[in-house]
């Protein structure tokens, strides 16, 4: 399933929200979303299960929950506007969905930056089979 998410990120191009999220991650962390965040831990990438492995994986868990709370929105494809002012992401005008999606992505990108010190390479390309514990609730 994660492979599909990686392919989606690569195929979406500049017209999709996943591309924008990737750009936010790059600007906030200095790391490319692929490979650093697309298959990290139990929640970074498509879907998620089990317990988050660390603070970075928890950022992805919270991001999944944020997307899950959106109604009638398409967070992986809806394009939104945002800018950066003095290093701060500012979500722009748009529909309520676009604004909420932007805020979810912004929170995750900032969370990744705030947890760079505890990022562990051993959780990159983490096997799903090791994520079988009961999932937390959002």
Curated annotation (Swiss-Prot):
Region (Important for membrane-damaging activities in eukaryotes and bacteria): 121-133
Pfam families for the chain: Phospholip_A2_1
Disulfide bonds: 42-131, 44-60, 59-111, 65-138, 66-104, 73-97, 91-102
Subcellular location: Secreted
PROSITE patterns linked to this entry: PA2_ASP, PA2_HIS
Site (Putative cationic membrane-docking site (MDoS)) residue list: 79
Annotated signal peptide: 1-16
Tissue specificity of this protein: Expressed by the venom gland.
Keyword Secreted attached: yes
Gene3D superfamilies linked: Phospholipase A2 domain
Main localisation: secreted
InterPro entries in UniProt: PLipase_A2, PLipase_A2_Asp_AS, PLipase_A2_dom, PLipase_A2_dom_sf, PLipase_A2_His_AS
Site (Cationic membrane-docking site (MDoS)): 133
UniProt GO cellular component terms: extracellular region
Site (Important residue of the cationic membrane-docking site (MDoS)): 121
Residues under site feature: Hydrophobic membrane-disruption site (MDiS): 130
Keyword Signal listed: yes
Residues the UniProt record annotates as site (Putative membrane-disrupting site (MDiS)): 31
Site (Putative hydrophobic membrane-disrupting site (MDiS)) location in chain: 19, 26, 32
PANTHER family according to UniProt: PHOSPHOLIPASE A2 FAMILY MEMBER, PHOSPHOLIPASE A2, MEMBRANE ASSOCIATED
Protein family according to the UniProt entry: Belongs to the phospholipase A2 family. Group II subfamily. D49 sub-subfamily.
Role this protein plays: Snake venom phospholipase A2 (PLA2) that shows low enzymatic activity even tough it conserves the catalytic residues. Shows a strong myotoxic activity and induces indirect hemolysis, anticoagulant properties, and cytotoxic activities. In vivo, it induces muscle necrosis, accompanied by polymorphonuclear cell infiltration, and edema in the mouse paw. It exerts its function even in the absence of extracellular calcium, indicating it is not a calcium-dependent enzyme. A model of myotoxic mechanism has been proposed: an apo Lys49-PLA2 is activated by the entrance of a hydrophobic molecule (e.g.
The name this protein goes by in its record: Basic phospholipase A2 homolog bothropstoxin-II
Species the sequence originates in: Bothrops jararacussu
Taxon lineage: Eukaryota, Metazoa, Chordata, Craniata, Vertebrata
